[in-house]
Structure formats: structure tokens, C-alpha cells
Amino acid sequence: MKINQWLLNTLSTTLILLMAGQLDAQSLSDISFGTDETFEVVTWNIEWFPKNGTATADSVGRIIESLDVDVLGLQEIDDTTLFRQVVNNVPGYELFIAEGWFGGLAYVYKTSTVNIQSIYKIYESSLFWNPFPRSPLVMELTFMGEDIVVINNHFKCCGNGLLDMGNSSDEEYRRYEASFLLKEYIDTNFSSSRVIVLGDLNDILTDNYANNVFKVFLEDPTNYRFADEEIASGASTDWSYPGWPSHIDHILITNELFGDLSNPGTEVQTIKVDDFMSGGFSSYDYYISDHRPVGMKIQVTPASVGFVEGSNTHIEIFPNPTHGKVSIDLTQCNAPTELSITDVHGKSIYTMRCPKGEVIDLNVEGPAGIYLVSLESGDTKSVTRLIKE
């Protein structure tokens, strides 16, 4: 039977419109990741935005608003004018887009929690175009009074899986060289700073040593760690790039954040936006991107935690971690003690003046997370971290 071509075209157009309607009707607004108690950062390649016109733009705006995170590092933004309109329609967020022929890198950040110190590109010279076809984009920011550095990247794609050291035309070597130069820059300029390196790094963490483009970081576990390493070595259903099943979008941290990474409330995950769309990943890939976002949320411990001045106070806190009830042993203190407990944002939870030489029993109210126990006794002051599970 011969089918009228006009009818086929009409049915095809109708199907696309119905899919778009389903997309609008689905629960993108139910996506969530950010909280008031944590710092959240997300890397997301949105595949030369907009992949499918206004449907893409509308959906990306809803996703950004629903994620409710502090910082998004984005790659592959083609229509910068349209993307700026999208972000302008998301309450409480601002946009920075890198300029340049092969840019496509951007930051979207929450203005109520993130104070930008500076944003700039590094390795811009033509000498570095081979390892960095897109110059890394550095954001120096302050979150709740704490300094954090984020470096957004989009490494060279493709290759054959074999690292040919010294071959400047080898894609794996170009990614290796980019990793080497990034580490060199961080070691030189941010040796004691909290640094988060993120982006579409276009390679997997689990390659053998000989072919691993990230070996310079993996060889220095004292100072660097991939926060998403468990995802990389886990089930393929959780990977960031399902079309060619692999996990190639990463979040790397420096040792100043190791403690925060292990704290209660920390989460690192591939955010499966496709789970909130009726067509699953096929619909997500059609309308939005072939990459899923990868996010990390942590409770940032103030840099002053652990600071002690004066003589040893011989104070013990137990159990630590706790589920709420805690005892603070002041029996070795020979003077009355001012005790205060705050959360990591400085909100007062408990204050009291304690007689010398007592054990104080308390119930720490509030959600699981990090609390700071401050004690002043005579001319001695200490700040100790208390973890509530």
C-alpha cells in the first residue's frame, strides 16, 4: 500500500509536537540537588546548546532552577544570546560566558550564596592550543565566607584508547598534557587553596596506568582525588555518557577538600535528568544533551577549624561522630569555660558558661552535618569539629 508522503510528514510533525508536550508535562520541576546547608557544584556538557530549539531552552531553564545548586560549570554553549535569555529567566542566577573561537564554557551561579572574586581564562596563548582547544575557565569565589577555586574544562575528544607519549597529534597525549599543565598551574598558584577541577574531560578514570591520561593526578593521591571515582568504577547505568557507555565528565578536588568530601551530607552523583522525562534517555538526548550532569554537594568546613591558641585545654568530646547526645569533658580545665556550638554557617545552636572541672552532657539539635564546638577557658581558646550523623 502506498502511503501519502504528506500524511507521513504530518504524522511525523504531530509526533514531535506530542513529544514536546510530554516533555513540558513531565516532572523536570521535581529534580532536586541543592540544599541550604551545602555547597553544590555541577559539571554539565549541554551539547552545543540549543540542541532542539526552544524546547531545549525551556527545558534547560527548568532544570537549572530545579537543581538549585550554587555553581554550574557548563560546556558546549553555541547560541550564547539565547542561553543568556534562559539564565535571565531563572530567578537568583547569573551567567558568565567565556569569549573566543572555541569557547563554549560558562558558569551559572547563585547570587545569594556565591560572591565572585574573579573569573578568567588560563593557557590562552597559541602555544597551548594543542592541549587546550578550549582554554580552562577559572572562577575564584567566596561561599559563606570561605574561598573556593573552580576550574571549568573541556578536553580534546576522541582517540583510540592508547596514550602515545610525546606525540602531539595523539588525542590521548593531548589530554594527558592538559592534565599535566592543570596540575602544574594548581601546584604553583593554589598550593593551599580549595580547588575543584571539573568538566567534560573526554576520558575515563579506569584506564590502565600506561594509557591513563589522568596519571599525574592519580600518582599524587596525597593532594588530588577524583570525587566521582566511585561512579567511574561502578555500574554503567550511573555513567555520564550513556550513548557510548562511559564516564567522562569528572570532578577533581585538592586535599583541602578531602575532609569535607568524607563528611555526612556529602553526595557525588550523576544526575539522571532523563529519569524525569517520559521518553527516558532517548527523549533527553533528543531535546537536551548526550551528557548527563555530574554534581557534588559538600558541607564546607571553615578554614579556621582546628585552630588552637594558648596551652592545651585537655578537652574531650565523645562520642564523635554522634547521633545527637554528646558529652564534653572539662575535668582538666582549671577555670570556668565559655562553651558555644554553631553550625558551619555560624548559626548559634547552643551557648553556656560551664563551671570548671565538669562533664557537660548535651543533645545537639539540628540536622546531620558538621558543628563547631568553641571553648574559651582563661587565656586559651579552641575550636573542635563535631560530626552529627
Question: Can you describe what each PLM-predicted range is?
Answer:
Residues 26-29, 80, 118-120, 129-133, ...:
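Metal-dependent phosphoester-hydrolase catalytic domains
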Residues 45, 154, 199-200, 291, ...:
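Active-site glycine-centered loops adjacent to acidic/histidine catalytic or metal-binding residues
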Residues 53-72, 134-238:
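Extracytoplasmic, non-cytosolic globular domains
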Residues 46-51, 68-76, 125-128, 164-173, ...:
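Second-shell loop/turn segments in exported
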Residues 308-389:
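C-terminal outer-membrane/trafficking sorting elements
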Residues 71, 77-156:
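Structured beta-strand-rich core segments of catalytic domains in phosphoester-bond hydrolases
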Residues 23-90, 100-104, 179-180, 194, ...:
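N-terminal, active-site-proximal structural segment of metallo-dependent hydrolase catalytic domains
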Residues 1-27, 305:
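Bacterial Sec-dependent N-terminal signal peptides
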